[in-house]
Amino acid sequence: LILDAENCQVQKFGENGTFIDAYGSCGTGDLEFNFEHGTGDPDGGIDIDSDGNIYIADTGNDRVVKLNSTGGFVKTIGTAGNAAGQFASPVAIEIDSNDNLWVTDEDNGGKIVKYSTEGVYGSLEIKNDLVDPASVASNSTHLVVVDTNDDEVKTYKISDGDAAPKTTFGGNGSSTGQLYNPVDVELDSSGNIFVVEEGNDRIQKFDNTGSYKALIENGTSATFDKPSAILLDNDGNIHIANTNNNTLAKMDANELV
């Protein structure tokens, strides 16, 4: 599944890249989306729960939209506002291993909101030390958050309900281990952290403590042109979405060792 922000759609492709279907259009209705952020730039996020339901961060409409596995509308989650559980530009979604729904909300001072997949507010909000939380990933114990304007990655131990960051790494720069405009993050089964940098046109790999391990730069194993999203599949492949040239790049995760 690919979120096509410019066309207000979710597009579905097969494993070989063959187009299958598209869901949605531009607007404010049940199966309509608006992915424009306050800057005018397209934004939004997508994830799938254990039953195959699809969750979309409908950024411009300040809500999350839930679809079934065939793209049919199920419900909206959240409302616009500044109160607990409300959204102002939700931009990314993560479904954790317990089917909890985590939503990054950029314009409410920077926070992450927890919901159930049925749309019940979970009363936990992470706000500490966040400026511009653009993406979130998880494993059974931790959330990993890309804080774009700080050029940092922050980890939170959600298993104990603590909203304070446990690890912070990165910092502005172009050297290995530094970050410039990081926009997306993903974890592998070993807890390694993969970070996409639009500013440096590259992907870096860190271990679960935030120590640098490897990188793929533009023009080495793939061509990057404002990379904006990353997905690790079950076969050990990395898929990267390039915003400027509207392409997907695929590579073997073992190249980052």
Place the predicted regions along the sequence by residue.
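Flexible "stalk/tail and boundary" regions
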Residues: 1-257
